[in-house]
Amino acid sequence: MKILIIGHYPPHKGGVANHTNNLVKELRKKHEVHILTYGPIKPRKFEREFVHQVKVPQIFGLRGILFTFLAALKTIKLQKRTKFDVIHAHYVGTTSYAGILAKEKLNAPVIVTAHGSDLDFMSNLPLGRYFVKKSLSKSDLVIAVSHHLQKKAISMGATKIRVIPNSIKTIKKEDAKREYITFIGALTPYKDPQTFIKLAKQFPHEKFLVVGNGPLRTDLEKRAPKNVKFLGYKEDVGGILSKTKLLVVPSLREGFGLVIIEANSLGVPVIGRAVGGIKELIREGKNGYTFKTFEELVEKVEILLSNKKALKMGKIGKTISSQYSWERIGHLIEESYREVLGERNDNCNKHARKGRLEENQSSCEIY
């Protein structure tokens, strides 16, 4: 198959960029994969032929909108030259709507993946909500990374939807003493790092680690007790998780919570707020605990610090995380492509039997 991925991609950073990067690596084992992303960027040498970009100015509030319309035009242009079988847009809103706008001119289905912050953030903006609803209702298939997002997408107009979770690349464990209670994530309000700092004050004899950057960092550093260490953003979390005995995820909302699977893969138990995708990933008392109040959080931390249950949870977590390999997730996504293409072929055959193939030719051709 020839596949076009639309969305953030390295050197861009963040969850979506990491996801598309790993998905592309997996799909390229069997298929020709191209990427259309935000520019200007300097693609890696080995993939310059396959990475296309839309250069958009850094204008706050307008960059995403400009990308939408310019990326739609670029997609149509690329399709005429390359003839993709599938267009797969990541992040519902400005990115996905680029594919939807181009869809009438394309000879390929458009698939959209909802990652979490897209439905939460974009749907709160008037124009963003329009982009989201159109993308969900007009796409050939919506992929949600959790059942929580699936329900939300259906409530906003998605009709054809499938749950395929995020995945993780293999993380190498380093030989290190597990001595830290760790937070990994952006230092933004919805990740609620303030609760983590508050927790550190309750356990003055424990070592706490904050991994990530964001607008709240300066204020957090001022308020943090001496037992908290700030490391900033780290691309590779393997070394950090190898030193971690407990991961805390206090996010106020979360579409999936990839860091939970990453921690589990190295045998680290997780305590996370009982919201969104976090509730789906943490199996109570098996690979961690969930909490609703700060008092519950303190209680769960005390339980894991005071007995050997954390060691047992770590072993169970490793087993659970093995279900989220990129080989498996990549296969499920590839399977979705084939299902959508198969349905289009079926529709084409129906039109042919009714003698209407010619008038429906543009929507039936599969290259």
Residue ranges of predicted features:
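Conserved donor-binding/catalytic core segment of Leloir-type glycosyltransferases
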Residues: 4, 174-203, 208-211
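A short, well-ordered alpha-helix in the C-terminal region of glycosyltransferases
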Residues: 309-323
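Conserved acidic donor-binding segment of nucleotide-sugar-dependent glycosyltransferases
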Residues: 284-285, 289-295, 303-308
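Aromatic "clamp/platform" in nucleotide-sugar-dependent glycosyltransferases that forms part
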Residues: 233, 252
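An amphipathic, basic-hydrophobic alpha-helix
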Residues: 48, 60-86, 94-101, 105, ...
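Donor nucleotide-sugar binding/catalytic pocket of nucleotide-sugar-dependent glycosyltransferases
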Residues: 112, 122, 129-172
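N-terminal subdomain of nucleotide-sugar transferases
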Residues: 1-41, 201, 326, 364-367
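Short hydrophobic beta-strand element within catalytic cores of glycosyltransferases
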Residues: 260, 269-272
